[in-house]
């Protein structure tokens, strides 16, 4: 348990120690810019592969699961 807490503490503190800057694509950054795009779930209407969540592809205007990936459509 103590090891887990120590590991999480290191992950939280490490970026500030090494001078890491927060990414532009953080949730707070996206909210500030009004960029509130959300991915679409299985069966929802889409226009392109990037509209669909994770492993889903846009095929015939719907987000679907494919066996061969999105690049083949």
Swiss-Prot record:
Signal sequence segment: 1-20
Keywords associated with the record: Cleavage on pair of basic residues, Disulfide bond, Ion channel impairing toxin, Neurotoxin, Secreted, Signal, Toxin
GO MF annotation list: ion channel regulator activity; toxin activity
InterPro entries assigned: Conotoxin-I_CS (IPR013141)
Principal location class: secreted
Propeptide: 21-35
UniProt GO cellular component terms: extracellular region
Intracellular or extracellular location(s): Secreted
Domain of life, per lineage: Eukaryota
Annotated S-S bridges: 39-53, 46-58, 52-63, 57-70
Tissues expressed in: Expressed by the venom duct.
Similarity comment: family membership: Belongs to the conotoxin I1 superfamily.
Written domain comment of the UniProt record: The cysteine framework is XI (C-C-CC-CC-C-C).
Protein name: Conotoxin Bt11.1
UniProt source species: Conus betulinus
Taxonomic path: Eukaryota, Metazoa, Spiralia, Lophotrochozoa, Mollusca
